[in-house]
Amino acid sequence: MPVSPKIIKKHEEMFYPTVRVRAKGSGGSGTVVYSEKHGDECHTYVITNHHVVSRCIKVEKRWNPVKKKKMDTEILDTVYVEYFKYNNYSHCIGSFAIEADIVAYSEVEGGQDWALLRVRDKETPAPYVANLFPETDIENIHIFDPCYAVGASLGHAPIATNGHICYMDDEISHYRYWMSTAQTIFGNSGGALYRYSDERKEYEYIGIPSRITVQPMGFSSDPITHMGYFIPIERVYNLLRDNDYHFIFDDTMTFEECAKRRGEEVPDDDLGEESDETEEE
């Protein structure tokens, strides 16, 4: 019996962009949000939570030969992003890991709890990339909107749950979080929450599952899995913009412009005709 096009669409737009993130004995989930070729190289980016990769971020006192003294030096260790392979759409048959670099982050202690990874595979684009909810349409997200949470719950291959947006005005460490009833648990952190757009006929990424409600019970605490906090898409966009990666969602900004803002060199192939004219002069 043929698989329903609706089921295929859900797999391709929500399930397959999900990756598992492993970082020095800890782990969680991530979502592929961009994968394009610029010049001769592919550039693939994954969004996750800071607390998923925090063990790979440290600051050490190291000798600076120019300043002639020990200075705080940021050390970023390698992170591993795991893609999954499936048979008949739904049956996971394994995974393969690719090294990735932490290129931007905001610490969990500051309330933001966000990180951006760049996959080191420069030859092959990611096969599936999440559709991002348009920044100009955020005011049309409401309580009772159906949603789906997808992530590597408890370290498993991706698991999908459904629910609805149930609260949009909680503040944790002075930053706004939204809440959904789509069940999430440890390991979902860094994954994705999706909402279907009737207008654009696609499932769209609207936030990062980041926290779960915990109820103290005597000497232990029980997780309330149907009350999960997620970082709303508006904050995700602000973080990307603050770190000069807004080409990921903003069509008015180019990859090259953002790279220049970050002080990175742009390959000649990416500079276009203006670069060629400069060389001729």
Tell me what each language-model feature is.
Residues 36-43, 68, 89-94, 110, ...:
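Short, solvent-exposed loop/turn segments that connect beta-strands within catalytic domains
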Residues 44-48, 113-121, 178-180:
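A generic structural motif
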Residues 9-76:
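Catalytic histidine site
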Residues 14-19, 24-28, 120-131, 157-241:
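Active-site region of chymotrypsin-like
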Residues 24, 54-57, 70-172, 206:
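Serine endopeptidase catalytic core focused on the charge-relay Asp
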Residues 2-9, 59-76, 205-281:
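C-terminal cap/linker of serine protease catalytic domains
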Residues 49-51, 152, 198, 211:
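Short, surface-exposed secondary-structure boundary micro-motifs
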